[in-house]
Amino acid sequence: MFPLSGCWRTELLLLLLLAVAVRESWQIEEKSCDLVGEKDKESKNEVALLERLRPLFNKSFESTVGQGSDTYSYIFRVCREAGNHSSGAGLVQINKSNEKETVVGRINETHIFNGSNWIMLIYKGGDEYDNHCGKEQRRAVVMISCNRHTLAGNFNPVSEERGKIQDCFYLFEMDSSLACSPEVSHLSVGSILLVIFASLVAVYIIGGFLYQRLVVGAKGMEQFPHLAFWQDLGNLVADGCDFVCRSKPRSVPAAYRGVGDDQLGEESEERDDHLLPM
């Protein structure tokens, strides 16, 4: 009885430890973006955009602005908690003079949309204003612009709009290649002509080779189509270059020709008689 009771106690203790471990793992699991609206009615386009930004989930971006007592640091993460991990903040502002942390936007109220070369990520549900914007909750608007040369960078605050009664926001910008639309490669006219020319040359060589071998019955180099023409091509090119490029006129053959001794007849001595003195 006693050994059996001790065994049961050990098993219960192990189950209790396992339950505590599972509970702790659930608690420390990082939160992710929760789109505005009901879970089963989320926009497929927004879900696809968040999946597109997944390579940035494990990155943290920080930027510091101002000087003196008005120096603020902004920490931003994509679909991950920034700053105090229990706050659910996606973007926080830290006052460097007193290290006070203000939540600008939370990831549990995320809205996202895009254009041809940009993505707009919005975190709502930040800490309430004290005396501005009707004491509404803060909101962070991050403009992610296309930059094909970097995965992510150049995170900077642009401005804070708090002069209105409502719909105030903090505006930020950053660069990322993930915001770029896919490049569509088009063949140029020259490339198309080159492909056509290469295809015609291949058809000419293969077709001519088969014809020479199967129909004519040629062997060896004679199987190459129009072999005599290609062998004489160099001379033809040289003649054409000589005809087109040379500016010096060609030597014109003489209009007369020499006469050989065998073509000369015997001259009569009477031809010179009139030269003798009388």
UniProtKB/Swiss-Prot annotation:
Principal location: membrane
Domain of life where this protein originates: Eukaryota
Keywords, alphabetical: Disulfide bond, Glycoprotein, Lysosome, Membrane, Phosphoprotein, Receptor, Signal, Transmembrane, Transmembrane helix, Transport
Glycosylated position list: N58, N84, N95, N108, N114
Molecular function terms, GO-annotated: protein domain specific binding; retromer complex binding
Post-translational modification Phosphoserine, affected residues: S268
Ranges per topology, Lumenal: 22-188
InterPro entries the UniProt entry points to: Man-6-P_rcpt, Man-6-P_rcpt_cation_dep, Man6P_isomerase_rcpt-bd_dom_sf, MRH_dom
Membrane topology per record: Single-pass type I membrane protein
Subcellular location: Lysosome membrane
MRH domain ranges (all copies): 31-182
PROSITE patterns linked: MRH (PS51914)
Annotated disulfide bonds: C33-C79, C133-C168, C146-C180
Transmembrane segments annotated in the record for this chain: 189-209
GO biological process: lysosomal transport; protein targeting to lysosome; secretion of lysosomal enzymes
Segment forming the signal sequence: 1-21
Topological domain ranges for the Cytoplasmic compartment: 210-278
Domain-related comment: The extracellular domain is homologous to the repeating units (of approximately 147 AA) of the cation-independent mannose 6-phosphate receptor.
Additional comment: This receptor has optimal binding in the presence of divalent cations.
Function recorded in the entry: Transport of phosphorylated lysosomal enzymes from the Golgi complex and the cell surface to lysosomes. Lysosomal enzymes bearing phosphomannosyl residues bind specifically to mannose-6-phosphate receptors in the Golgi apparatus and the resulting receptor-ligand complex is transported to an acidic prelyosomal compartment where the low pH mediates the dissociation of the complex.
Name used for this protein in its record: Cation-dependent mannose-6-phosphate receptor
